[in-house]
């Protein structure tokens, strides 16, 4: 699963927000995630890790997670370019149509 697909899931976006500013243990992420099971949180963390959105660091028995801001920012930059190009084309088409309607 790529980063875009991984972030399509609302709980994963919530988890990413939790680990954006600081490293957190899996248990802390679970407690902050509301009514979701620890197993589900672990699955979401695995998907986010495999997609490159978060990094995991082992500290003894603890597993610490932190957002990979560089990877997420690269995705955002790609999306901005994509939407910018499409919006520019839409603007051009709209202006042409408006011009044709004036004639």
What are these regions (language model features)?
Residues 1-6, 10-37, 62-73:
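N-terminal helix-turn-helix DNA-binding core of bacterial DNA-binding proteins
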Residues 45-46:
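Short, hydrophobic-biased segments on the C-terminal half of alpha helices
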Residues 49-60, 64-66:
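Beta-hairpin "wing" of winged helix-turn-helix
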Residues 54-56, 71-74:
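Alpha-helical interaction segments
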Residues 17, 21, 73-103:
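Amphipathic alpha-helical dimerization/coiled-coil segments
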Residues 6-8, 58, 81:
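Coiled-coil-like amphipathic alpha-helices with heptad-repeat character
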């Amino acid at each position: 699963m790529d980063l875009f697909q991984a972030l399509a899931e609302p709980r994963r976006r919530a988890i990413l927000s939790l680990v954006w500013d600081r490293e957190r243990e899996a248990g802390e992420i679970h407690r902050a995630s509301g009514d979701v099971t620890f197993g589900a949180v672990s699955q979401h963390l695995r998907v986010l890790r495999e997609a490159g959105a978060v990094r995991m660091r082992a500290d003894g028995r603890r597993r610490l997670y932190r957002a990979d801001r560089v990877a997420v920012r690269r995705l955002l930059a790609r999306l901005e370019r994509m939407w910018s190009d499409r919006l520019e084309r839409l603007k051009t088409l709209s202006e042409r149509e408006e011009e044709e309607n004036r004639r």
